[in-house]
Curated annotation (Swiss-Prot):
Gene (name only): Men1
GO biological process, one term: regulation of gene expression
In-chain residues carrying the UniProt-annotated modification Phosphoserine: 487, 543
Species annotation: Rattus norvegicus
Coiled coil: none
UniProt name for this protein: Menin
Cell compartments where the protein resides: Nucleus
Subunit structure: Component of the MLL-HCF complex, at least composed of KMT2A/MLL1, MEN1, ASH2L, RBBP5, DPY30, WDR5, HCFC1 and HCFC2. Component of the menin-associated histone methyltransferase complex, at least composed of KMT2B/MLL4, MEN1, ASH2L, RBBP5, DPY30 and WDR5. Interacts with POLR2B. Interacts with POLR2A phosphorylated at 'Ser-5', but not with the unphosphorylated, nor 'Ser-2' phosphorylated POLR2A forms. Interacts with FANCD2 and DBF4. Interacts with SMAD3, but not with SMAD2, nor SMAD4. Directly interacts with NFKB1, NFKB2 and RELA.
Length: 610
């Protein structure tokens, strides 16, 4: 069973528009042919990014010249996907799969695939790969790479399994995606899960197993169960997002960028990106590079990605906020970038840092120890230059420098680190070390003391009540940390605090944090209640509401440092010691009292040694 007559009429594919027409035709069907589309994309990517030299020893292969926008008068060459080439690759893949899997040995009751059948298909793909190759190399994600080079990356293996299952007529097997891993779901309602590929350094022994253990340990790799369960159209979107336009470390293929952008807009118009936050972020990045007339601007698309994560995935995804923060960072919008990074840390704080979460750790490490320090350093230089030469700087430059005079920017920075510290609590692996502390102190020092003191850090009433409870520190530790260690995958995520609020009357800016979880802020209603209660108490006059942002820390480390953070002078040694101490030691020995007592007693304990 090969290509259908309607599919054959669309060949040869001589241009980007021809490829888009093929995708549009397949997306109009109930079951778009994943094998065909992946082979076409892999073919085009190979000759536009991997091997751009026009081969002379392949008589069937030709290139279609067309005018190039840059330089003017130049030509660009598009590899012509001839029917004979694609049909031969298609026949080879389907014959290999159907010849290796005997469906009569795996009864499918009610048309539902069994775990043994899914495992068998994954074995066929797995055993067809080369025994030795660099698994993270570029351009090995498509079925073209699988057929012509017997190489696939991790997510490519999962996609190949789904494509093979479709070729076998197993319509209940679909791709499941987190932000750094892929597996399959199957069954009548997709309730069954199965590992089919490796992650990181490899986990071959997990193939065929469920992902329940990863969900239960609350690792980011499995998103606490809030992962994407794809249908066929979203699987097409996945292969489009997987297009790698890079020719080398410094050059991208303009043709592949244009192809990816047009295909993503096609999927967007058909509504197939609504449940795909990372695809929306990918499209927004492409629009920032080359805007499409009459289309939404990148900022709108970034916020659509965040809205998708909130609507369909309990706001448990990290990268929608990372995309937004990256956009603001590139455009030197310091305040908005810090806010988006703080929102990112607010999401991660409800996870446990596990061994296989190294990719998101690298992201946060780079942001905290490279991107933010350099962004604030640049802002400080602009602020200093503006003070020396007032009136000479552009408005945008002044706004970047003035971020260091904005207490809300400082509050966002604290909220970012509070989320990281909370992420570490209850995790089997420590997150913070002295490298983090060094750059935290450096970033804090970019803000003047009077700016830092405008941030009001308050304690929750629950902490005061906890200090009065008769049972000991061990019981409090167990109650605080127990749910993070013993949460079940079906439990809903814990409720979170409202987003960062400025003084009374201030509105929440666009791109603000998720309302259900944030690193501790006090809402206007709560502050109003506290103020009215204070007014009823016998006092000469009612206390005015705070002018600056009000912040409530969620992590024990940041609670212990709250007076150090807003002090006139920064005690770098104390902050470094506090930040790098193990959470288990801190939480077990701490006596809940005033913040200053907490900090000093903790520092003394470290000097003596444990």
């Amino acid at each position: 069973m090969g290509l259908k007559a309607a599919q054959k009429t669309l060949f040869p594919l001589r241009s980007i528009d021809d490829v888009v027409r093929l995708f549009a035709a397949e997306l109009g069907r109930e079951e778009p042919d994943l094998v065909l589309l992946s082979l076409v994309l892999g073919f085009v990517e190979h000759f536009l990014a991997v091997n751009r030299v026009i081969p002379t020893n392949v008589p069937e292969l030709t290139f279609q010249p067309s005018p190039a926008p840059d330089p003017p008068g130049g030509l660009t060459y598009f590899p012509v996907a001839d029917l004979s080439i694609i049909a031969a690759l298609y026949a080879r893949f389907t014959a290999q799969i159907r010849g290796a899997v005997d469906l009569s040995l795996y009864p499918r009751e009610g048309g539902v695939s069994s775990r043994e059948l899914v495992k068998k298909v994954s074995d066929v793909i797995w055993n067809s790969l080369s025994r030795s190759y660099f698994k993270d190399r570029a351009h090995i994600q498509s079925l073209f790479s699988f057929i012509t080079g017997t190489k696939l990356d991790s997510s490519g293996v999962a996609f190949a399994v789904v494509g093979a299952c479709q070729a076998l007529g197993l319509r209940d097997v679909h791709l499941a995606l987190s932000e750094d891993h892929a597996w399959v779901v199957f069954g009548s309602n997709g309730e069954q899960t199965a590992e089919v590929t490796w992650h990181g350094k490899g986990n071959e022994d997990r193939r065929g197993q469920t992902v329940n253990a990863g969900v239960a340990e609350r690792s980011w790799l499995y998103l606490k169960g809030s992962y994407m369960r794809c249908d066929r159209k979203m699987e097409v979107a996945f292969m489009v997002c997987a297009i790698n336009p890079s020719i080398d470390l410094h050059t991208d293929s303009l043709e592949l960028l244009q192809l990816q952008q047009k295909l993503l807009w096609l999927l967007y118009d058909l509504g197939h990106l609504e449940r795909y936050p990372m695809a929306l972020g990918n499209l927004a990045d492409l629009e920032e590079l080359e805007p499409t007339p009459g289309r939404p601007d990148p900022l709108t698309l970034y916020h659509k990605g965040i809205a998708s994560a909130k609507t369909y995935y309990q706001d448990e995804h990290i990268y929608p906020y990372m995309y937004l923060a990256g956009y603001h960072c590139r455009n030197r919008n310091v305040r908005e970038a810090l806010q988006a990074w703080a929102d990112t840390a607010t999401v991660i704080q409800d996870y446990n840092y596990c061994r296989e979460d190294e990719e998101i750790y690298k992201e946060f490490f780079e942001v905290a120890n490279d991107v933010i320090p350099n962004l604030l350093k640049e802002a400080a230089s602009l602020l200093e230059a503006g003070e020396e030469r007032p009136g000479e700087q552009a408005q945008g430059t002044q706004g970047q420098g003035s971020a260091l005079q904005d207490p809300e920017c400082f509050a966002h920075l604290l909220r970012f680190y509070d989320g990281i510290c909370k992420w570490e609590e209850g995790s089997p692996t420590p997150v913070l070390h002295v490298g983090w502390a060094t750059f935290l102190v450096q970033s804090l020092g970019r803000f003047e003391g009077q700016v830092r003191q405008k941030v009001h850090i308050v304690s929750r009433e629950a902490e005061a009540a906890e200090a009065e409870e008769p049972w000991g520190d061990e019981a409090r530790e167990g109650r605080r940390r127990g749910p993070r260690r013993e949460s079940k995958p079906e439990e809903p995520p814990p409720p979170k605090k409202p987003a960062l609020d400025k003084g009374p009357g201030s509105g929440q800016s666009a791109g603000s944090g998720p309302p259900r979880k944030t690193s501790g802020t006090v809402s206007g209603t709560a502050r109003g209640t506290e103020v009215s209660s204070a007014a009823q108490a016998p006092a000469p006059a009612a206390s005015p509401p705070p002018e600056g942002p009000v912040l409530t820390f969620q992590s024990e480390k940041m609670k212990g440092m709250k007076e150090l953070l807003v002090a006139t002078k920064i005690n770098s040694s104390a902050i470094k010691l506090q930040l790098t101490a193990q959470s288990q030691v801190q939480m077990k020995k701490q006596k809940v009292s005033t913040p200053s007592d907490y900090t000093l007693s903790f520092l003394k304990r470290q000097r003596k040694g444990l």
